[in-house]
Amino acid sequence: MDLTRTLIIGNSGSGKSWLAQRLAEQLCVPWTDLDRIHWLSDEHSIPRPRNEALGMARGAASEERWVIEGVYGWIVSEILHRATALIWLCIDDVDCVANIRRREAEAKDDERLLAMLEWAGSYHTRDDSSGCAAHQRLFEGFTDSKTQLMDRAEITDFFGAIRNTG
């Protein structure tokens, strides 16, 4: 698998950031989290203007080597043509929600967290560019190297294999 420019998609809480960070370190390439492009603040409450976000994503994807990860299909569709590899983390919604709860253990059940949990819990039924059906279309349309990982064990094994060959 040619990981020169790797794009990782999947639900919130699926492990995209975990895998992206480790791949980027292993491959010595920059890592871009599309949350940092889509949102103006760390609270994920104010979205960046669409054209500005797309411009930032295109800029990151114009580099020679990278790992980019995110849930936003409307952004991914604009940069997918630059990727040499696509990794889809298609993890069960219940596992994604549990992972978010672990990750946000210090957070109180505020409105933002509850909204994120509800959104992650609807990945397989959502009919928007960030839902499972949209990610499946992106995955099926991608003609270069790609893999679909269905659970955390597969994600860990995939990274272990990359680490052992690098």
Q: How would you label these PLM feature ranges?
A:
Residues 12:
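The conserved Walker
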Residues 90-134:
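A glycine- and Lys/Arg-enriched "phosphate-lid" helix/loop adjacent to the NTP-binding pocket
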Residues 18-64:
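Conserved substrate/cofactor phosphate-moiety recognition/catalytic segment
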Residues 2, 126-166:
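NTP-dependent small-molecule kinase module
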Residues 5:
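Walker A (P-loop) ATP-phosphate-binding motif of ABC ATPase nucleotide-binding domains
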Residues 15:
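Conserved glycine(s) of the Walker
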Residues 8:
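Hydrophobic anchor at the beta1->P-loop junction of P-loop NTPases
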Residues 49-94, 127:
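Glycine-rich phosphate-binding loop used to anchor ATP phosphates in small-molecule kinases
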